[in-house]
């Protein structure tokens, strides 16, 4: 029963990725004063399934000098890594509440760097390798700030369980108590998922499409799905940590949709950053702010519970 329920949840998650791409294309269309996809099905609602079919039935070509087996396996491993992190999502039949959910999330999200690196290396292409190096350095840089932000809230709550974050936000959200930290978190999430304005793996002028430049058809679709799976799960974690959401309420899913739309909105409005400014932002701005908040939360905890240390 557990296996059936988990597989059913993964199917629902994969379908949600399709409709998330439809929402993105529709939103970008209306923001740019055009219609977006509206031909397949009623108002284009079947467009994701049409795109998926057209990608997976294409002929798969392999670069002559690529490492064939690793090149073939890498997108599948990237998708498995993105799906594996959804074990953290609690649902009724198999309510998995990890006591170490925070550490599990950090471990799984940091594993995505290896997928980027192997994809760029196995293609044996100069452009994909260059995009891979930039993506990996960006992901590792922002992973540090992301971990420090989560460490600060761990010091405040004394728990790695995501459900405890909801219990501590029944009266006021953490996004209101620590607004700068919330902005830092959202920026780090965009950099972690290679989204605009931090999408340096896809610099069209010099890198074509980044680390996945040699992939096409079904292999590209797997990389695309894994990227959007990560975006949806990052939005879900943001809802839990900063917006006090209960999984059993409708408001949780409304907040999740609004956060997903926020990622789309930023993509449609902001230009791409310069790479040196990106690194400056990670190491000189976000990391000090997160360290200051760690010190602040630790001092607050010490003042409130100082009698335990006597």
UniProtKB/Swiss-Prot annotation:
A Gene Ontology term for the protein's cellular component: mitochondrial inner membrane
GO molecular function, one term: NADH dehydrogenase (ubiquinone) activity
Topology with respect to the bilayer: Multi-pass membrane protein
EC number: 7.1.1.2
Functional description taken from the UniProt entry: Core subunit of the mitochondrial membrane respiratory chain NADH dehydrogenase (Complex I) that is believed to belong to the minimal assembly required for catalysis. Complex I functions in the transfer of electrons from NADH to the respiratory chain. The immediate electron acceptor for the enzyme is believed to be ubiquinone.
Family: Belongs to the complex I subunit 1 family.
GO BP annotations listed: aerobic respiration
Organism listed in the record: Dalbulus charlesi
Name of the protein in question: NADH-ubiquinone oxidoreductase chain 1
Subcellular location: Mitochondrion inner membrane
Keywords assigned: Electron transport, Membrane, Mitochondrion, Mitochondrion inner membrane, NAD, Respiratory chain, Translocase, Transmembrane, Transmembrane helix, Transport, Ubiquinone
Lineage: superkingdom: Eukaryota
EC category name: translocase
Membrane-spanning intervals of the chain: 3-23, 69-89, 100-120, 137-157, 171-191, 223-243, 246-266, 278-298
Reactions catalysed: a ubiquinone + NADH + 5 H(+)(in) = a ubiquinol + NAD(+) + 4 H(+)(out)
């Amino acid at each position: 029963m557990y296996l059936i329920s988990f597989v059913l949840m993964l199917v629902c998650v994969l379908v949600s990725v399709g409709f998330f791409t439809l929402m993105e294309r529709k939103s970008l269309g209306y923001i740019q004063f055009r219609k977006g996809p509206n031909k397949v099905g009623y108002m284009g609602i079947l467009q994701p399934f049409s795109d998926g079919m057209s990608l997976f039935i294409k002929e798969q070509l392999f670069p002559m000098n690529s490492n064939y087996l690793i090149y073939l396996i890498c997108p599948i491993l990237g998708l498995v890594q993105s799906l594996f992190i959804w074990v953290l999502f609690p649902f009724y039949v198999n309510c998995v509440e990890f006591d170490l959910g925070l550490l599990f999330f950090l471990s799984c999200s940091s594993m995505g760097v290896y997928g980027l690196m192997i994809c760029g290396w196995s293609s044996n292409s100069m452009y994909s390798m260059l995009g891979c190096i930039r993506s990996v350095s960006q992901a590792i840089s922002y992973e540090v700030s992301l971990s420090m932000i989560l460490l600060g809230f761990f010091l405040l709550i004394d728990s790695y369980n995501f459900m405890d974050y909801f219990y501590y936000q029944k009266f006021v959200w953490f996004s209101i108590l620590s607004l700068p930290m919330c902005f830092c978190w959202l920026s780090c999430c965009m950099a972690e998922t290679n989204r605009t304005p931090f999408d340096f793996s896809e610099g069209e002028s010099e890198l074509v499409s980044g680390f996945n430049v040699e992939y096409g058809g079904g292999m590209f679709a797997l990389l695309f799905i894994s990227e959007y799976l990560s975006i949806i799960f990052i939005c879900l974690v943001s809802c839990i940590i900063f917006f006090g959401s209960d999984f059993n309420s409708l408001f949780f899913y409304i907040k999740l949709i609004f956060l997903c739309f926020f990622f789309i909105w930023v993509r449609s409005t902001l230009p791409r950053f310069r790479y040196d400014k990106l690194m400056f932002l990670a190491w000189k701005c976000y990391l000090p702010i997160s360290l200051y908040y760690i010190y602040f939360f630790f001092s607050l905890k010490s003042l409130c519970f100082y009698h335990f240390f006597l």
